[in-house]
UniProtKB/Swiss-Prot annotation:
Catalytically driven reaction(s): deamido-NAD(+) + NH4(+) + ATP = AMP + diphosphate + NAD(+) + H(+)
GO molecular function: ATP binding; glutaminase activity; metal ion binding; NAD+ synthase (glutamine-hydrolyzing) activity; NAD+ synthase activity
GO BP terms in the entry: NAD biosynthetic process
InterPro entries documented for this protein: NAD/GMP_synthase (IPR022310), NAD_synthase (IPR003694), NH(3)-dep_NAD(+)_synth (IPR022926), Rossmann-like_a/b/a_fold (IPR014729)
Keywords per UniProt: ATP-binding, Ligase, Magnesium, Metal-binding, NAD, Nucleotide-binding
GO cellular component: cytoplasm
Official protein name in the record: NH(3)-dependent NAD(+) synthetase
Amino acid sequence: MSIQKQIMNDLHVKPSIDPKQEIEDRVNFLKQYLKKTGAKGFVLGISGGQDSTLAGRLAQLAAESIREEGGNAEFIAVRLPHGTQQDEDDAQMALKFIKPDKSWTFDIKSAVSAFTDQYKKDTGDQLSDFNKGNVKARMRMIAQYAIGGQEGLLVIGTDHAAEAVTGFFTKYGDGGADLLPLTGLTKRQGRRLLEELGAPERLYLKLPTADLLDEKPQQTDETELGITYNDIDDYLEGKDVSSEVIEALEKRYLSTEHKRQVPASMFDDWWK
């Protein structure tokens, strides 16, 4: 089996999908997992990007379906800006589309600043912009888990196949969650689900950005990765791509394996 086929299998990618069926299956997964755990609902940070918009709407549909069946469940959408967010209008548009049961805002800027100031005071070193960006991602997850713990909710993650294959997420930041309803989807497949759900085009056609760097605000994922999502999706869906794309993706996949595993122990062999 080729590495490409192995990656497709490992990440549960289908070359083609039925958007309606995928929506139904993923909503059912959220419902079943929630019932199994006995939690009271879900919480997710909403950025205004494609992934959190899709995961948020699926979570809301799951909560509503559980209530229609006589159960109790709620979805809390959380805005987690670092000060003023340049694309705040998109975040508000996403919330309007998702229609969450509750919407809260938790500005992480003061918490991040307190940490970076203390880091410099105690180490004598200024935290790099890259590592500060990871602190932002982890602070957002701290906030979501605090809300989840306080309210009895499960934290939803937005990782999907195009992020998983590149390792393009912060370990124990946006990579930390209780359940992942977008697993196996390529970026373009996620767009198809949002289109099926009736989301505004602006939310799934905008260029994806993690927006974690102060020095490069709104830098796109594709700029940071050096690979387009079209190429990533083509690879994951088993289509022909250039040798340069194959080499770049497979190199990233192998080098970021630690992000897709639980912490290594002497009894594991995936890292050897």
